[in-house]
Curated annotation (Swiss-Prot):
This is UPF0162 protein BUsg_167. It comes from the Bacteria. Transmembrane segments: none annotated. Belongs to the UPF0162 family. It holds the Pfam family Transglut_core2.
Length: 269
């Protein structure tokens, strides 16, 4: 596994950061294919929007190309969540999630010098375009459609809390590292659900290099180790979580798991 510490996110674009982290997680990640396919898509998009002068019209045309002509969009039918997160797979199937589709569209738009940025909204990634006249567009990466304030408020109330309110900071531009962390969080959960524990462990270790002392991430790594029957290191991580988050209701469940692992160790010895 390559060293995560060698990645300088401040010098890499978002897409290059995602490619670099994907290479660390998956030995079979097809970097050459991804770079080549993205290069060709940027080239095609540049030609497709070249007839427009105004940036807002260029962006509208790019949305049409990405979601209608190329037919990128939300996954349908039966699928594994990790399959719609891996960038190489999304490029092949053209089916993704808000975060994977958003990262791809954002890369193409930024290569074409369009004023588009990521926003890590409480419910999903969205894209934000800021225009000279102070107007902004908020775009849903699932389908390329514009989002209004009412829709965002409905999302908050339906997914977070019936009393949740929309605040200005909910729509602030996100730094690349925040988007990467969001994607890795979702990917780790998907891989744990799919019982791909070795890959999930790689993701967890990446997240811990971003935020080394996060007790929740240490807890998740402990749960992954427990699944892999690496009981000694699992105990270290799970005990760390219980000690640092004693008030968290999950701590009681983790204590039961710690006891079960300790009992197993006693039986083995």
């Amino acid at each position: 596994m390559k060293s995560f510490s060698n990645i300088d996110f401040s010098k890499l674009s978002l897409i290059d950061s995602i490619i670099a982290t994907s290479q660390i997680i998956r030995e079979d990640f097809p970097t050459k294919f991804v770079i080549s396919d993205l290069y060709n898509k940027v080239k095609e998009a540049k030609f497709y929007i070249s007839s427009e002068i105004e940036p807002n019209l260029k962006l509208k045309k790019l949305l049409k190309l990405f979601y209608k002509t190329w037919n990128f969009g939300a996954a349908s039918g039966i699928y594994k969540l990790s399959d719609v997160l891996w960038i190489d797979n999304v490029l092949k199937t053209r089916q993704g999630t808000a975060v994977s589709l958003g990262i791809l569209f954002l890369h193409i738009a930024q290569e074409l010098k369009l004023p588009l940025n990521p926003v890590v909204f409480p419910t999903q990634l969205i894209l934000r375009a800021d225009w000279i006249n102070k107007k902004k567009w908020l775009i849903n990466p699932f389908n390329g459609e514009m989002l209004d304030q009412h829709t965002l408020e409905v999302w908050l109330k339906g997914n977070i809390s019936p009393t949740a309110e929309l605040y200005e900071h909910d729509l602030y531009k996100a730094e690349s590292i925040t988007v990467i962390r969001k994607m890795l969080d979702i990917l780790k959960s998907a891989l744990m659900e799919e019982k791909k524990m070795e890959l999930a462990l790689n993701v967890s270790n990446l997240l811990l290099q971003i935020n080394p002392n996060d007790p929740y991430e240490i807890r998740d790594r402990g749960l992954i180790y427990a699944n892999l029957e690496c009981n000694h290191v699992a105990l270290t991580d799970l005990i760390y979580f219980v000690e640092h988050c004693p008030e968290d209701p999950i701590s009681e469940i983790i204590k039961v798991q710690i006891h079960a692992i300790e009992q197993k160790k006693m039986i083995l010895h």
